[in-house]
Amino acid sequence: MSASRFIKCVTVGDGAVGKTCMLISYTSNTFPTDYVPTVFDNFSANVVVDGNTVNLGLWDTAGQEDYNRLRPLSYRGADVFILAFSLISKASYENVAKKWIPELRHYAPGVPIILVGTKLDLRDDKQFFIDHPGAVPITTNQGEELKKLIGSPIYIECSSKTQQNVKAVFDAAIKVVLQPPKQKKKKKNKNRCVFL
């Protein structure tokens, strides 16, 4: 095993999409039942992924507009972002490209972004959509299209309530830092002028 490396992972996304629940689910294997905006303390633990031990530092952020000026302070030194939207909220899905990508590109250019669709357990819950007639489910294909649009290397859907794919989200975040995806080579311009 290699020596432990520190990785700073910051979660971002609209308020109430499930960022804090995802962090609590990952770190304590429990699901909080009450919504309390951002009550997750920064967390650090040694994690082994593919034989590599890393010290994973998790930072939660508040998605509400009241925090627009404070939130970017937590971006400094980030190795990877987990950008979350809710699979049952079209507005949070649209804000990925409209709000979050411009903010992250401005304050932390070049830092990889893992795109995550949360609340997977509710997407196929017919009763939820009966109780919330304005809610619009986001499909896996829509998530994949958004991944391409924003240039994210990975898109994962998860449920903090059932813990489906929650560990996969953080494993992917660690892997993208340890083994960054290869950049596509730009094609060389073959039509060059040469003066003799």
UniProtKB/Swiss-Prot annotation:
Its main location: cytoplasm. A lipid is attached at C193 (S-geranylgeranyl cysteine). Ubiquitous. Preferentially expressed at the tip of root hairs. It is a peripheral membrane protein. It comes from Arabidopsis thaliana (Mouse-ear cress). A motif (Effector region) lies at residues 35-43. GO terms for molecular function: GTP binding; GTPase activity; protein kinase binding. Gene3D superfamilies: P-loop containing nucleotide triphosphate hydrolases (3.40.50.300). GTP binds at A16, V17, G18, K19, T20, C21, K119, L120, D121, S159, S160, K161. GO terms for biological process: pollen tube growth; root hair elongation; root hair initiation; small GTPase-mediated signal transduction. Residues 194-196 form a propeptide. Interacts with GDI1 and ROPGEF8 homodimer. Binds to SPK1. This is Rac-like GTP-binding protein ARAC5. Disruption phenotype: Fewer and shorter root hairs. Belongs to the small GTPase superfamily. Rho family.
